[in-house]
Amino acid sequence: MLSSVRPSVRPSACPSAPPARRRRGTAPAAVLAATALLFTSACTVANSDTGGAVGAAGGNTLRIVLDQEPPTLEPCESSLASTGVVVRSNVTEPLIERDPTSGELRPLLATAWRQTTPTTWSFDTRPGVTFQNGRKFTAKDAAFSIDRAVNSDLSCNVDGYVFDDSGVEVRATSATRLTVTTAKPDPILPLRLSFIEIVPRTTSTEAKVREPVGTGPYAIGNWQTGVSITLDRNDTYWGKAPAFARARYVWRSEPSVRAAMITKGEADLATALDPKDATEGNSVAYPNNETTALRLDGREAPLDDIRVREAIDMVIDRQAISDTLFGELGEPAAQLVPKGVVGFNDDLTPTTPDSEAARALVKAAAADGVPVDRRITLVARNGQFPRVAETAEALQYQMAQLGLNVKILMTDTAAHLQYQLRPLPENVGPIALLIMHGNQAGDAAFTASQYLLSKSPQSTFGTRELDRRVAAATALAGEQRQKAFAEVFAYQNEAVAQYVHLAHMRGLLGLSSSVRYEPNSATGDELRLAAVTPAEEKGR
């Protein structure tokens, strides 16, 4: 999903991180350690309209504190992590859901599906389901929701992110059956449809909605802008009723504040904690499928020279960054997707730092007239992940070892998206953008279509050969698909080098002793409230 943009792609018990291999005596590691110490700080819990607590402590309200207020609750934007964490599978539901642990597709509002021709799929919808406004759910609503998200002029995040510009043809053939036809064979269409939340066919197609109606276990009760969002249990829900009668979200930008709210009993769940604020008693780690990377704008000198891009890749000490700043929440990466995603390449390994060879590449580029002294702006987002500012400073320091002139620009989410998504800003010079990509869908096609193509929404450039390889891999299935996408990631590293991969990440969820919940790789994008129970209901 957007972790920032899910453009993440979204959508278990968390395995322990492998032991970190610390490097002693390296200049980057020493600087990282010093930087980390400089940025530690103490915070107190901010006041709220309930005296600091998220809701009625000890009552039947589940209290959640987020790292930011959702920009919208529009269902067709639910692949944005900040929206999906509230809406997805809570207020609205898709036809099909992907099990975040096994990767299997499971029936939700669709009970069965089948491919009837190379380009057509048929879906049977679940009978006896009603929307929160009392309207009966039928296949017409499902067809409408797909058409609204993919074929309308709403510019939904799912359109172009999950589906390409060719659109789909969708038709309800009865009250309980619909067909979806694509322009070309699509072996993962059911997976793509798991990103589309179903809404009533009375929903506006002219404008995005602020407070949607869905079929989920909770309905929106109240959104007090800047203060809180309250969800009320949907007593007509077709599935198992959730344990809590209501849920209340507030948001605090400082991770130390969110952690303190758990410790002080003011919240039950808290997203995106910082390792320095986490303890065994207030948090749990989980694999979140996120990968941090530096995207280099290959349109602007000196980053338009592959030697400079390769030099940056070679000088970055990923192990030092992971050990010193990420702790057990980061593992050095060599590609944009983690293990478990279709297309992950087992043969790729993180680049071993080689400052001498990297400096030689920059020197050769300079000798050929490349303006290697031109200022590069390293753009990162406040709150993007724990210790993001220190990470940006570490990258700046290491790039400076090459003689590159790097300036850091820390932004808010809105400004960061302007650098991340097309149309890209003009007249801003060469940009090195710190990104965090999460492939929750479990298939490399979602990553490649967003980040690797020449015209991808989140790429700055590409090559015809890489475009060709991605197109060929997308049409395949099974082992052929796995092999082809693994080769795509290898080719990106060897011949394009748009990305300097940093680390595969883990998340930290604040969890109070009053509730029971097992986070999984989708938790940061769709925190399913129905999976949370009071402590006395289930042993931890």
Task: Describe the residue ranges of each PLM region.
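Periplasmic binding protein-like
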Residues: 64, 269, 397-456, 483-486, ...
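N-terminal lobe/hinge region of extracytoplasmic solute-binding protein
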Residues: 65-117, 213-214
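Aromatic- and charge-enriched surface segment that lines or borders ligand/interaction sites
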Residues: 111-155, 302
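Extracytoplasmic/peripheral linker and loop segments enriched in polar/acidic and small residues
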Residues: 114, 407-410, 414-415, 446-513, ...
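Surface-exposed binding/hinge segments that line
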Residues: 158-202, 222
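Gly/Pro-rich hinge or "lid" segments in bacterial periplasmic/extracellular proteins
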Residues: 186, 191-242, 246
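Ligand-site clamp/hinge motif
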Residues: 206, 235-279
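Append "and occasionally in soluble cytosolic enzymes with long acidic Gly/Pro-rich linkers
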Residues: 304-397, 536-540
